[in-house]
């Protein structure tokens, strides 16, 4: 078996063009080996751009507007939202009661729908200079704000402290801030 392995190794070595000592010097550059297979240029893999399947067929005008809006940056989108709110005289908070009124059952218009407010905003109106540190500590205890952000919050009042919270949370936040010395209101 040893003689068979030796003869196979000798055959491979002698048939290899790179190991022939008579034709190549050890410092010479070896020749490049090319693989026998090549991809033809006609069999390239190309991505096919398919149009997404949509549930609603939109007119060309709507598709154009949608593509323009989707190409906006975040800053441009924010400016667009502000512009449309100013143009139509709406705010995000004014849309929630309107949606609830639309969803309410119609009783022929005879009964007036009385909406009970479910979301409240806590507004810090004033902070006396003698109680600024205590109010900053209370703000940090009620939120996850850092010291710098809490300090900036109580400057340039009135400012909304918390938005869209329940009545119980609003009452508790108001109580805590008033104990610290701030003048607070719930809207």
Curated annotation (Swiss-Prot):
Q: Name one Pfam family in it.
A: Ribosomal_L12_N
Coarsely, its chief localization is plastid
- Transit peptide where, by residue? 1-54
Biological process terms in GO annotation: translation
Task: Report which superkingdom the organism of origin falls in.
Answer: Eukaryota
User: Which Cys-Cys disulfides exist here?
Assistant: none
Which Gene3D superfamilies does the UniProt record give? 3.30.1390.10, Single helix bin
Localization per record: Plastid, Chloroplast
Question: Which InterPro entries does the protein's record reference?
Answer: Ribosomal_bL12, Ribosomal_bL12_C, Ribosomal_bL12_C/ClpS-like, Ribosomal_bL12_oligo, Ribosomal_bL12_oligo_N_sf
Which keywords does this chain's UniProt record carry?
A: Chloroplast, Plastid, Ribonucleoprotein, Ribosomal protein, Transit peptide
Any single GO molecular-function term of the entry would be:
mRNA binding
May I have one GO cellular component term? plastid large ribosomal subunit
Family the entry assigns: Belongs to the bacterial ribosomal protein bL12 family.
PANTHER family in alphabetical order: 39S RIBOSOMAL PROTEIN L12, LARGE RIBOSOMAL SUBUNIT PROTEIN BL12CX-RELATED
Q: What is this protein called?
A: Large ribosomal subunit protein bL12cx
Gene from which the chain derives: RPL12C
